[in-house]
Amino acid sequence: MANVVVIGAQWGDEGKGKITDLLSRSADVVVRYQGGVNAGHTIVVDDKVLKLHLIPSGILYRETICLIGSGTVVDPKILLKEIDMLIDNGIDISGLKISSTSHVTMPYHRLLDEAMEADRGSNKIGTTGRGIGPTYADKSQRNGIRIRDLLNEDRLRDVIEIPLKEKNGLLEKIYGIAPLNKDEIIEEYLDYGQRLSKHVVDCTRTIHAAAKNKKNILFEGAQGTLLDLDHGTYPYVTSSNPISGGACIGAGVGPTLIDRVIGVAKAYTTRVGEGPFPTELQGSINDQLCDRGSEFGTTTGRRRRCGWFDGIIGKYAVYVNGLDCLAVTKLDVLDELDEIQVCIAYELDGKEIDYFPTNSDDLKKCKPIFKKLKGWQCSTANCRKLSDLPENAMNYLRFLAELMEVPIAIVSLGANRDQTIVIEDPIHGPKRALLR
């Protein structure tokens, strides 16, 4: 039995959905512990492409409990669309559970998110415009609406009074947007509550019962380490804590319950939205990575910025998450390159540094120092074990493991489930050196 946290080791979009889907085969419970519909993961099953934003990837396994935890923010309209999509694809969603204390993204959150981002002009953060930040802000101000509030009309009427009055004032007087109608919102969201009610549970009790019965629990993070509110490239971050420590807060468990932390990292680096990106590429190689890697956001559809693998942010992710092992994804995207570069240090103000500057202004000034490695220039898409990989691909993986000082447990070579080399199952396997 092992309880495992899966986190993104870069700026999100690392392929966590596929890795979580893979590990969910061995999990009894999968818990999404933070974020909202600003996240997106794509899973390919039997040539079907399923795009999810809120529901954990484990929903594809009939016997698995999939819990949207207390640390998430839920847009019930989008959640119900996901539920309907899964049902239409013949997927049983009886295992879906939603924490009664998850906060709800309301219509005024989305409107404010879009208006505030537009108002920033050239200083925009790159938000998805899905209302995530304003929802978390209301939560912190103790002014939020929770899933449990959608189950009782009197309760909803009471708790919406103050935030709606406040938000309508902002929308109308500052942004020139027509105020929202209270009764219309209440009617709409009570209907959402009624449709979701059979899935609503006490998050902490559900997880505690599973742990007491020695079940395998998988904690699924959204976004990535460098988007963490406290430890990322602030202010170009999300509004929650994707790092492994966020699993304890968002799921309501103690750190001693966590047995292992696996970080997911692409074989190169991407970022969507604004913010510093030391290894960002321009020109033909950037276009090649973007096209071969289908680097367009699941949530926004925006083209992702692409760059070489950054070992400095990788080592930072190892440290702040306490990573036990890595899953390296999209190795196949590098197949056609004759030379691959990896950032091994930065130059900041004329001095070489080997650490991640937590000040975004300093990070913007950092120039990457690269190590050049030979490419393999042949397809890896059909490799199913390490011995199938070209020698230079193996050398590349070994170099990443040595640079980040953490073993590699999984290598992904495409979107399909079977395009994966599992060196060791992070749930069932013992902790030992892999690819080092």
UniProtKB/Swiss-Prot annotation:
Under Enzyme Commission nomenclature, its number is 6.3.4.4
Q: Name one GO cellular component term.
A: cytoplasm
Q: What note does UniProt attach to the cofactor annotation?
A: Binds 1 Mg(2+) ion per subunit.
- In this chain, Mg(2+) is annotated as bound at D13, G40
Q: Where does IMP bind?
A: D13, E14, G15, K16, N38, A39, G40, H41, T128, R142, Q223, T238, R302
Q: Which Pfam families match?
A: Adenylsucc_synt (PF00709)
The active-site annotation reads: D13 (proton acceptor), H41 (proton donor)
* First-listed, main subcellular location of the protein, grouped into a coarse class: cytoplasm
Report the InterPro entries cross-referenced here.
Answer: Adenylosuccin_syn_GTP-bd, Adenylosuccin_syn_Lys_AS, Adenylosuccinate_synth_dom1, Adenylosuccinate_synth_dom2, Adenylosuccinate_synth_dom3, Adenylosuccinate_synthetase, P-loop_NTPase
Q: State its location(s).
A: Cytoplasm
Pathway participation: Purine metabolism; AMP biosynthesis via de novo pathway; AMP from IMP: step 1/2
Annotated residues that bind GTP are located at 12-18, 40-42, 304, 330-332, 412-414
* Ligand binding (substrate): T298, T299, T300, G301, R302, R303, R304
The source's superkingdom equals Bacteria
- Keywords associated with the record: Cytoplasm, GTP-binding, Ligase, Magnesium, Metal-binding, Nucleotide-binding, Purine biosynthesis
Q: Which reaction does it catalyse?
A: IMP + L-aspartate + GTP = N(6)-(1,2-dicarboxyethyl)-AMP + GDP + phosphate + 2 H(+)
Question: Matching SUPFAM superfamilies, A to Z?
Answer: P-loop containing nucleoside triphosphate hydrolases
UniProt cross-references to PANTHER family, sorted A to Z: ADENYLOSUCCINATE SYNTHETASE
What role does this protein play? Plays an important role in the de novo pathway of purine nucleotide biosynthesis. Catalyzes the first committed step in the biosynthesis of AMP from IMP.
Q: NCBIfam families from the entry?
A: PRK01117.1, purA
Binding partners and assembly? Homodimer.
Which family does the similarity line name? Answer: Belongs to the adenylosuccinate synthetase family.
Q: What is this protein called?
A: Adenylosuccinate synthetase
- Provide the species name: Prochlorococcus marinus subsp. pastoris (strain CCMP1986 / NIES-2087 / MED4)
Classification of source organism: Bacteria, Bacillati, Cyanobacteriota, Cyanophyceae, Synechococcales
User: What gene makes this protein?
Assistant: purA
